Amino acid sequence: YNFKTNLEIKDTPIKIDFINYKKDKNLNSQFKIYGNYSKKFGLEFKKISLLSKNNKFIINNLLIDKNNKIVKVDKIDLDYFDNDNLKNKFIANRTKNNNYELKGSLLNADFIISNLLKSKDGKQLDIFKNNVNITLDFSDVYLDNYNVVKNLNGKLRIKDDKAYQANISATFDNGKKFTFTINTKDDEKITTLFSSKAKPLVNRYEFIKGFEDGDEGYLDFYSSKKDGISNSKLIIDNFKVKEIPALAKVLSLASLQGIADLLTGEGVRFTDFEMNFTNKGKLMTIEELYAIGPAISIL
């Protein structure tokens, strides 16, 4: 059967969590949706649109099967201000079969990154019926409210609702690099992340306060996962923190430089930090850790 709905929404909030959007109840919006349903093919939305002042959400030809999985979507056109009051503007087009192009001028990835870091290991998406290939092309991407990468390009392959392959790169304003890769072979998944600015990622951990990058600082992460066990290495170079976990803070007071750094509020400085660790289920085991700086060395 066919359906068609055209509504003017007043005095009603609308919340779309996965794109970090909430419509204020005082903002009037036009909502349109039409399509058809059949037992054989599932639910097909010919068009979904939500329009209001400064915000546009349009989806064309979205097909969902009886298991509520996306079979295909021809086009998604989004232009809106999110809950951080940052503008997002991008279009997703299906180019051929299960290949998609995601292209835009602005994307706030802060919400996406935070959710990925908070997600529980092993939690799987349940979105796509088919494996999909996505090409990415963004002019500006916010990593948080203050840090932006430019010319983000790359490719992402999703297989069995998991990120199977990825090769993504971008640059900061100073021309330094940001890269992210995933390579899966013989049931082993290797993930790498390199950022010439560590702050946009490290600042998300509440127990670390006042983190600042040095001019030559960077973050380098490598992880190999197989049979539910991951072996990882994290390196952060040239940084300082104003508040650090209790053990490191006590150790830093063993040197005159550490006392001076903490009392003056300058923070404890490190030239090198490296940690090797494994994850299995909910258990993380730190195999080796060292941090070196003028005020403190931890081995």
Predicted regions located by residue number:
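Membrane-proximal interfacial segments on either side of biological membranes
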Residues: 1-289, 296-299
